[in-house]
UniProtKB/Swiss-Prot annotation:
Superkingdom assignment: Bacteria
Protein name in the entry: Crossover junction endodeoxyribonuclease RuvC
Family: Belongs to the RuvC family.
Catalytic reaction(s) noted: Endonucleolytic cleavage at a junction such as a reciprocal single-stranded crossover between two homologous DNA duplexes (Holliday junction)
Keywords of the record: Cytoplasm, DNA damage, DNA recombination, DNA repair, DNA-binding, Endonuclease, Hydrolase, Magnesium, Metal-binding, Nuclease
Keyword hit for DNA-binding: yes
Amino acid sequence: MSITTPRILGIDPGLRVTGFGVIELHGKQLVYVASGCIKSNDKESLPERIKTLFAGISEVIATYQPNQAAVEKVFVNVNPQSTLLLGQARGAAISALVHADLPVAEYTALQTKQAVVGHGKAAKDQVQAMVVRLLNLPGAPTADAADALACAIAHAHGGQGLGAMATAGYRIRGGRLIG
């Protein structure tokens, strides 16, 4: 990887499971590097779980050496307690990224889905299918890893969705990526 090659770490934060995905942008081509999940033990205290997420993301950064990061923004849940817990997990992720001196971009789930699938109301399986297609993967990553990869893809295309992909040379018809 040269210093000019964007290597983007996408993060889908969660207290139980945080997805990560690393891609590179070679000219106009997206290249898959790695993806996976960082899991915390729900039997541990909240501070221990936050520590696990911070350490896990720090390890991903050390292993894959990204030079940019994209994180999914928190949505307001019906349950305020769930929203607060998700916000704390997101804070751990952003702290690890900033601690590694990475620039951090933030995208809502709607922006990410719009960028990858073409509409903001896409189901998780649609996001997974488009991630597989855009990155030419042999199989579908887990939902959390796919969401993280989708966030990285949205960032790679400037968060501009399928319009940016068409400009990058992808063929789009009726809001869908084709052959």
